[in-house]
């Protein structure tokens, strides 16, 4: 009877592990606000990301968030946030683009000027040579090139 029970528990644990779909890797959570308004606070799947001042981000990390290893198509997270008065809570489900769980440094959330929210699991930060967000939407200020900011720093406030 004990052997049958142990076998049953072993099968149950195997089944639960298969449903989970793999191991996880824990990394820091960081936000970037590309908009003109503060984000009162944001969350990713219930993990608190904190306050984001307009046109700021990347300077503060919160611990921690787990991502699946390995990545697989269709992975999504629920991003929640409030407005600059910490009111009007909203949520959006966002797909996680492909990442290499062996080369992660942070889980990045971007609140973009066009209203989109994008997430990435990169090794480095915004403006770094391999950072996935590029082009006009990448700058924290309109017209700003984060690669130049990453290389030389921000030359004063552009407000």
Q: Locations of the language-model features?
A:
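Structural beta-strand segments of beta-rich domains
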Residues: 25-27
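Tryptophan-paired
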Residues: 42-88
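Bacterial signal peptide processing site
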Residues: 20-22
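Bacterial N-terminal signal peptides that target proteins for export
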Residues: 1-8
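Flanking scaffold residues of small Cys/His-coordinated metal-binding clusters
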Residues: 11
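Structural motif
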Residues: 29-38
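C-terminal motif of bacterial Sec signal peptides marking the signal peptidase cleavage site
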Residues: 14-18
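Beta-strand-rich cores of mature extracytoplasmic or soluble domains
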Residues: 82-159
